[in-house]
Amino acid sequence: MNLYDVIKKPVITEKSMYALEEGKYTFEVDTRAHKLLIKQAVEAAFDGVKVASVNTVNVKPKAKRVGRYTGFTSKTKKAIITLTADSKAIELFAVEAE
């Protein structure tokens, strides 16, 4: 698996925005990716970023209905990335001051 295929998109929720204050960044990642691969992908994708730890969460599929048909959403995996103290911030999550 290519390192640039591991990270799918950032997770922008109220909970993940509060975690930014603690230096924790949340991404949706490939379901086959393991913690070491996620760490290597983040450090390769963002310059000057050093990862201290990676926590992962497997998100179960949810039942959805469209009319009389029922189905399920796809399962996903979230990774919560904690950066070291001497690491640069990830600019993707930068909040502009007004």
Swiss-Prot record:
Q: Name one GO cellular component term.
A: ribonucleoprotein complex
Q: Which Pfam families match?
A: Ribosomal_L23 (PF00276)
Biological process (GO) annotations? translation
One of the entry's Gene Ontology molecular-function terms is:
structural constituent of ribosome
Keywords associated with the record: Ribonucleoprotein, Ribosomal protein, RNA-binding, rRNA-binding
Q: State the superkingdom.
A: Bacteria
Subunit architecture: Part of the 50S ribosomal subunit. Contacts protein L29, and trigger factor when it is bound to the ribosome.
Give the protein family.
Answer: Belongs to the universal ribosomal protein uL23 family.
| Function field | One of the early assembly proteins it binds 23S rRNA. One of the proteins that surrounds the polypeptide exit tunnel on the outside of the ribosome. Forms the main docking site for trigger factor binding to the ribosome.
Please state what the protein is called.
Answer: Large ribosomal subunit protein uL23
Q: Which organism does this sequence originate in?
A: Streptococcus equi subsp. equi (strain 4047)
| Classification lineage | Bacteria, Bacillati, Bacillota, Bacilli, Lactobacillales
Q: Which gene is the coding source of this polypeptide chain?
A: rplW
